[in-house]
Structures are given as structure tokens and as C-alpha cells.
Design a protein with these regions (language model features):
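Dinucleotide-binding Rossmann-like beta1-alpha1 core, especially the glycine-rich loop
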Residues: 74-152
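N-terminal Rossmann-like FAD-binding beta1-loop-alpha1 element of flavoenzymes
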Residues: 24-53
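Helical element adjacent to the flavin cofactor pocket in flavoenzyme catalytic cores
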Residues: 138-140, 162-212, 217
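Glycine-rich FAD pyrophosphate-binding loop
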Residues: 46-66
Length: 501
């Protein structure tokens, strides 16, 4: 089964960008080529700065490629949470920001006549098991002035009490972004290896960038020396399937813990859910989604399936603004918590305003320097959980060897007296590399759903061969394939039906 999203499969106008070689100086540098980084670069260039964007792999290949692409202020249960922790004023401010973000995306699509499947839909949010929670959501949204209605709705999960918001939007995110004119330079396959926060120099594999303004938009912030983001963010993975031939005329979101998200696309519907902390949980998400889709839409073919990762803050608000106290002209965008479309547009304007010294109504709302109770308690729990993963991983020493690894699977094993991660190809070929994440040395975990190695502490991910996929790690795992002995190589080979090798 393919693991490309429906957006990637239908992204036919893919343009290649060069790798940065050499040293350059610019007015603004954006690190990270997702929707947040791209829109931030767009706004910084719009304000007259010579702007460069660098992406470690391919433009829009990360979280943006795996989004369900809903442009909406109707974001699950966020408003009651904000109202409880910070009061209605903050909840209303967040609602206003999302309306502005929606308007920004719509204006850009109209201004540049972008054909990206932009479509207005109704959005239904509900708890299929707790109507009181649905009523509470409606009450909060009414109190803050959100345009919603409490209705009995026919959803894919059946007839439920739901909060309906009209005039929300869905679109093809990659077509939108690729059609948005880039008045800035783009470099792909250009991974930031270090950030000198004093001299504002970012070093890459084959060059460096000196910038007056630096924006870190890498999903997970990569400057560990400031901001304590490894404690303030939880890496979360979600799973989605595309069901061919199924239909839905709105978007649907069940806010119970294991609830699902459904939205139409050109050719069927996407069904998403089974969110979990990266590197943890059982590995039956896609099977669960297929079973749920069959229950809702009958037996229909699944076109593709994919996973996406995002960072979640502990009060539900993104971190957008100054990276840390004492750092001048260095900014961060992170923590969208799976709601990155409208938030990216808001973040782009906020960063451009801060860089140019303009006031922005949402600076305090999204400030990475905020120290509120919703942040503190979640941060404390995250510190203990991350410490537990670090300690347990370093105390664990496997007894099994490479012989125990099944074809097409990975496992942490004992190899030449050391703990190594080993992957076995379907033909029996073995690959071995360091089992500890190069970021903070937590033990990696094999994800059989995506055929990747994931870090449960901070969400670094590596492909089956140990090559880096996503930050905060900045390098791939060290290879140890040369340590695989002849006996283990022989055990790894598939035997033919006649018993020969």
C-alpha cells in the first residue's frame, strides 16, 4: 500500500530547487519548507526583505503533505479548554485570529487566481458518546461570538448532537502553495546543521547563511540551547486513509479520545485518527481506520494511507514569536497541534510584524515566552515522561540478535556486543545502525505502520535505513552494517522453495 497522501499523489506540478552551496548573506532566512515556513517567507519578502527559505528535504514534504487541509476556526475542543485556563477573552482572541487566518488564505487564493479545489463546507464537531460535552462546546463558542449552531446531525458515525459551523473551507494544500508566487529564493536538500544565535549564521552541509532575521519553522524547533522547547512540546502522530468512492458533503470531527475525522476530497473521503505520541502506542492504526471506514461507508477500496506528525503545546496554543529571551531577531513557529492551516497564515503575519517592529494583536496570545498554568503543568508531566523514555531506553539491553528480525521489519538487537537498530529487507539483506537517537540519545522504536524508526522523547524520525526524516535530530544514525557477521547475513537470506539460498 502506498504511503503518499492524496495531495502528494495528485501533485503533478512538482518543481525542483537547488541545494545551497557556498556562503550567502540575506535579510531574512526561514528554516523549514512547510506551509508555515513558506507563508512566513512570503510575508517577509513582501515587506521588502531579501528572503531565503531552506528545506532539509523537499518543499512541502513533511507535515504539510500529510494534513487533512481544513481551513477552519472550528477546531475540536480548543475553545472550552482556553476559556477554562485563561478566560473567555483569550478564547475569543484565538477565535478572531483563526478567522483572520482563514480570510488571509482565501484572499491569497483569490488574488492569484489559484486553482486549488477551494470549497466552502459546513463543519460538524461533536462527541458521539457525551452530548453534554457537545453542549458545553456550543455554549463556549456562543459566549465568544463564534458563528455556530447546535443541531441534530446525520454524520458518518450516525445521528448525533453536533456543533455546526458554516462557511468553513477545504482545499488542496500543495496546489495552493505551489501556485503562490515566491518572491524569495528556495533551497531544497539543505539541512540546517547549526544555528549561531550570536552572529546569526546558519550552517548547512555545503554552505552557510548569514541573516538579519532568522525564522525557525521546522515543526520541532532545532535550537536546543534556548527556549526549552523539548520540554514544552509533545510530538504527536496521526494516521489517515483515503477511501475511494465514498462521499461526504461536510467535514466531521468526533472529539472523544479515539474519535475520527472525516472530510471529502476529489474522489472519495479521508478518514483520520488514532493519534498517539510519536514512538508509542499499538501499531494497528491503519487497520482500525479501515474497519471504521467500512462501518461508515461500506466495503470500498482504500486508495492510499499515510501518517503525519505535528507538535502539540500543553495549553493548545501554538508558539509563534521571539524564540527565547535574549535572542534578538530570531523567531519560531511551532505547536499547531494539528490545526496548521489558518494558524500558519496568522503566524506568517505575526512574524513579519515582529521583524518590522509593528504591533500585532496576537503577539501575547501566541508568545513562546508565556508562562501560564496550562503550560506549566503539561510541561512538568512531559519532563517526567521524556525522562522515563530516556532512562528506560538506556537501561534496556536486548538479548535477541539480528537473526530474530523478520523480513520487512526492524528491531533493536544485540550486535557484536552492542545495542543496534537492525532492519531486514524482504530479500533478507540486513542494515544496522545506532539504536540511540542522535538528538538526546533516547532509544529509537520501530514503527511497523510507517516502516520508520521514531523517537518517543522529541519526535525525531528516521527511515528504515537510519536516514534522518525529521528534526529535532540534525543528522542520520551512524551505520554499523559492517558489523553484521557472516552467520547473521546467512540467516538473513531468504531461502528458495527447494531449500537453496
Amino acid at each position: 500500500m502506498e504511503t503518499l497522501s492524496v495531495w502528494q499523489k495528485s501533485d503533478v506540478s512538482v518543481r525542483r530547487y537547488p541545494r545551497l552551496t557556498g556562503d550567502i548573506s540575506v535579510g531574512a532566512l526561514v528554516i523549514g519548507g512547510g506551509i508555515a515556513g513558506y507563508l512566513a517567507a512570503y510575508r517577509l519578502a513582501e515587506s521588502g526583505r531579501k528572503t531565503v527559505l531552506i528545506e532539509g528535504y523537499r518543499l512541502f514534504s513533511g507535515t504539510t503533505a500529510g494534513t487533512t487541509a481544513k481551513i477552519t476556526y472550528h477546531q475540536g475542543n480548543i475553545y472550552p479548554k482556553l476559556a477554562k485556563n485563561y478566560g473567555e477573552r483569550f478564547a475569543r482572541m484565538y477565535y478572531d485570529s483563526q478567522c483572520e487566518g482563514m480570510s488571509d488564505i482565501l484572499s491569497l487564493a483569490t488574488e492569484h487566481d489559484i486553482d486549488c479545489g477551494l470549497k466552502s463546507v459546513d463543519s460538524y464537531v461533536y462527541s458521539s458518546e457525551n452530548s453534554e460535552e457537545t453542549q458545553k462546546l456550543y455554549g463556549t463558542m456562543s459566549d465568544i461570538g463564534a458563528k455556530t449552531a447546535l443541531v441534530r446531525a446525520e454524520t458518518p458515525a450516525g445521528s448525533v448532537l453536533a456543533v455546526r459551523a458554516e462557511g468553513q473551507y477545504i482545499f488542496h494544500p500543495l496546489r495552493f502553495l505551489r501556485s503562490l508566487p515566491a518572491h524569495f529564493d528556495i533551497y531544497e536538500n539543505t539541512r540546517a546543521l547549526s544555528v549561531d544565535t550570536e552572529r546569526k549564521i546558519v550552517r548547512t552541509e555545503e554552505g552557510s547563511v548569514h541573516a538579519d532575521v532568522i525564522v525557525v519553522a521546522t515543526r520541532y524547533p532545532i535550537v536546543d540551547s534556548h527556549g526549552a522547547y523539548m520540554y514544552k512540546l509533545r510530538p504527536s502522530m496521526s494516521f489517515t486513509i483515503a477511501v475511494e468512492g465514498a462521499s461526504a458533503d461536510a467535514t466531521y470531527l468526533d472529539i472523544r479520545e479515539d474519535g475520527l475525522s472525516v472530510r471529502p476530497y476529489d474522489g472519495g473521503v479521508t478518514v483520520g485518527g488514532f493519534d498517539r505520541r510519536t514512538g508509542t502506542g499499538d501499531e494497528r492504526a491503519f487497520l482500525g481506520l479501515r474497519a471504521a471506514a467500512a462501518h461508515m461507508f461500506g466495503s470500498r477500496p482504500v486508495e492510499t494511507q499515510w501518517a503525519a506528525q505535528d507538535c502539540v503545546s500543553f495549553d493548545g496554543l501554538p508558539y509563534v514569536g521571539r524564540y527565547a529571551k535574549g535572542l534578538k531577531d530570531i523567531y519560531v513557529i511551532t505547536g499547531f497541534g494539528k490545526w496548521g492551516m489558518a494558524n500558519s497564515a496568522v503566524a506568517a503575519r505575526l512574524i513579519a510584524d515582529l521583524a518590522d517592529g509593528r504591533d500585532n494583536a496576537y503577539e501575547k496570545l501566541f508568545s513562546p515566552l508565556r508562562g501560564r498554568k496550562g503550560v506549566f503543568l503539561g510541561t512538568l508531566r512531559n519532563v517526567f515522561r521524556s525522562a522515563a523514555y530516556l532512562i528506560s531506553g538506556n537501561l534496556h539491553f536486548p538479548l535477541k540478535t539480528a537473526r530474530s528480525v523478520a523480513p520487512g521489519e526492524g528491531k533493536v538487537v544485540r550486535l557484536s556486543g552492542k545495542k543496534r537498530a537492525v532492519y531486514k529487507e524482504s530479500d533478507g539483506k540486513l542494515y544496522a545502525f545506532d539504536a540511540m537517537c542522535p538528538h538526546k540519545h533516547a532509544e529509537l522504536r520501530w514503527n511497523s505502520e510507517t516502516k520508520t524508526w521514531d523517537c518517543p522523547c522529541h519526535g525525531s524520525r528516521f527511515d528504515r535505513y537510519g536516514n534522518l526524516i525529521s528534526a529535532p535530530a540534525l543528522r542520520s544514525c551512524e551505520s554499523h552494517s559492517s558489523l553484521i557477521g557472516d552467520g547473521e547475513r546467512a540467516a538473513g537470506k531468504e531461502k528458495k522453495k527447494d531449500g537453496s539460498e
